Amino acid sequence: MKRLPYLLVVVLILLLAACGAAGPTTNINVTLTDFQFTPNQFTIPAGQEITITVTNTGAVVHNFIIMKLGTTAGATYEDDDDANVFWAERDIQPGGDFSVTFTSPTEPGEYEVICRTEGHIASGMVGKLVVVAGE
């Protein structure tokens, strides 16, 4: 009987340790200019909380769109590309910004990031989100 309280304490400690806090949020800052993303490639851990802050320092409206793994928008973004979007923020006015927190894709790989405004992909507004397996 004396072992039971000791055993319960050990089990409780193990359970609490298994429920440890989630890892820290990864913060990414992206600047949109005419016509590029800075940085144009960023790496994040898979399945983790991510905060992306995007600032448009350009003179025209831009968008920030993450395509699904294995898909691209091609030379231009068409309406049927909407089915291939992992996450999108549209119409970021010049001088505007936004910040969003979401769970990153769980599948490691390279995800295309684009501005879908007409002519912007062809002008070089294409970036890369690299998702790596968590530790």
Regions found by a protein language model. Give the residues of each.
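Bacterial N-terminal signal peptides that target proteins for export
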Residues: 1-8
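C-terminal motif of bacterial Sec signal peptides marking the signal peptidase cleavage site
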Residues: 15-18
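N-terminal edge beta-strand
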Residues: 24-50
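Extracellular/periplasmic metallocenter environments
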Residues: 36, 87-135
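Beta-strand cores of secreted/periplasmic/IMS beta-sandwich domains, seen most often
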Residues: 40-65, 98-107, 111, 131-133
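Histidine-centered active-site/metal-ligand motif
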Residues: 62, 75, 120
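Solvent-exposed strand-loop boundary residues in beta-sheet-rich modules
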Residues: 68-70, 121
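Short aromatic-acidic-glycine turn motif
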Residues: 70-80
